[in-house]
């Protein structure tokens, strides 16, 4: 979790794929640590950058696709979920970190069924 925490600004905000909002590294880690140690302990993520838009020399916005491949530790067993992430990145001490992140699960708007994008 130390490497995960290092990605974020101290006062970062995070909205997970279920709409749960937290603020600050401690709350972000508190939200993620239990699932990383249990249901996602044998899962992997594949990320694909869509775009980066510079707002200033020290602030940019990025969008990227993320595919979670859950393993046997997940109660539903092995399966995949695609999400679209939006981040606001800030440069701090010549290094980029996440100031804000929002994660949205791809679903069918009529049924709520989780859908996978075509790769």
Regions found by a protein language model. Name each.
Residues 52-61, 89-97:
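A short, structured loop/turn motif at beta-sheet edges
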Residues 68-79:
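Short, cysteine-centered beta-strand-loop-beta hairpins and adjacent loop/turn segments enriched
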Residues 65-66, 102:
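A mature extracytoplasmic/lumenal domain signature
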Residues 118-119:
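Extended, polar beta-sheet/loop recognition surfaces of beta-rich domains
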Residues 45-47, 63, 79-85:
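Short, surface-exposed coil-to-beta transition loops
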Residues 82-113:
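Short beta-strand edge/turn micro-motifs at domain boundaries
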Residues 1-58, 65:
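A solvent-exposed, acidic/Ser-Thr-rich amphipathic alpha-helical stretch
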Residues 14, 62, 98-100:
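Short hydrophobic/aromatic-rich beta-strand segments that constitute the beta-sheet cores
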């Amino acid at each position: 979790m130390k490497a995960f925490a290092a990605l974020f600004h101290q006062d970062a905000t995070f909205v997970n794929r279920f709409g749960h909002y937290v603020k600050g590294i401690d709350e972000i880690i508190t939200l993620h640590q239990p699932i990383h140690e249990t249901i996602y302990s044998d899962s992997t993520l594949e990320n694909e950058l869509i775009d980066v838009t510079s707002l200033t020399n020290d602030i940019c916005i990025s969008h990227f696709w993320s595919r979670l491949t859950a393993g046997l530790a997940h109660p539903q067993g092995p399966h995949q979920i695609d999400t679209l992430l939006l981040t606001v990145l800030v440069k701090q001490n010549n290094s980029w970190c996440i100031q804000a992140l929002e994660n949205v699960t791809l679903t069918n708007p009529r049924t709520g069924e989780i859908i996978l994008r075509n790769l």
